[in-house]
Structures are given as structure tokens and as C-alpha cells.
């Protein structure tokens, strides 16, 4: 008798695994961005912002954009319009998050140059 583990597996359409991974990274980046905006604009605790991890965050966002772009290319090959729409939406959200993060970093650099 073989012992078989019961493992729940997700079956995504072709290309949706990359899109799902990009969506999870988007939510992670959104949480970090909201925390940094809160520390920068509301509480003025600049030392609690994620300055030390800027390179890692930007690299992670570029990887997320690449995964979303590859997922949208796979979704374009399918006939399903919903998969294509969701993949392109996630790609646009990741691109917008990248530019929001970049603008926040430039604002923080400008503030540090003026006040320190």
C-alpha cells in the first residue's frame, strides 16, 4: 500500500501562474508603499521608512513587472478574454506601483538634501 499525501494543488490556465505571482508581489509592494507614505506624510518618522532596502524593492518591482509581462504574453495566446484582461490589469498596476515608488524615493531624497 502506497502512502499518498493529499496536497491541494491549484490548476491555473496557461500563463496565470506568472500573473498570480506578480499579483502577490504587487500586494507586498503596495503594503510597503502605504507604510512608507504613512511614515513620510503623516507621522514624519523618516527613520522608519525602507531606505535601506530601496535597491531590493526596485529590483523586486522590476521582476514583478517582467513576470506580469510574461503572464500577459501567455494570456494573449489563449482565447479567454478574462485571463487577458486580468493579466494586462496586473501589468498596469505593477507599472504604476513602480513609478509611484520611484517618485516617493525622489521626494525623500529631495527632502533629505534640503533638511540635512
UniProtKB/Swiss-Prot annotation:
- Keyword Cell membrane present in the record's keywords: the answer is yes
What's the chief localization of this chain? membrane
Record's Gene Ontology CC terms? CatSper complex; motile cilium
Q: How does it sit in the membrane?
A: Multi-pass membrane protein
Q: Where in the cell is it found?
A: Cell projection, Cilium, Flagellum membrane
Give the record's keywords alphabetically. Answer: Cell membrane, Cell projection, Cilium, Flagellum, Membrane, Transmembrane, Transmembrane helix
- Where does the secretion signal sit in this chain? none
Q: What is this protein called?
A: Cation channel sperm-associated auxiliary subunit TMEM262
**Source organism of this protein record:** Homo sapiens
Amino acid at each position: 500500500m502506497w502512502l499518498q499525501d493529499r496536497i491541494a494543488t491549484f490548476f491555473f490556465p496557461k500563463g496565470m501562474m506568472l500573473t498570480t505571482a506578480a499579483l502577490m508581489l504587487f500586494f507586498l509592494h503596495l503594503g510597503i508603499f502605504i507604510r512608507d507614505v504613512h511614515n513620510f506624510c503623516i507621522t514624519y518618522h523618516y527613520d522608519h521608512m525602507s531606505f535601506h532596502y530601496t535597491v531590493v524593492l526596485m529590483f523586486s518591482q522590476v521582476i514583478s513587472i517582467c513576470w506580469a509581462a510574461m503572464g500577459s504574453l501567455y494570456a494573449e495566446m489563449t482565447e479567454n478574454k478574462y485571463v487577458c484582461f486580468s493579466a494586462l490589469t496586473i501589468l498596469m498596476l505593477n507599472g504604476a506601483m513602480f513609478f509611484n515608488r520611484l517618485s516617493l524615493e525622489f521626494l525623500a531624497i529631495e527632502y533629505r538634501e534640503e533638511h540635512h
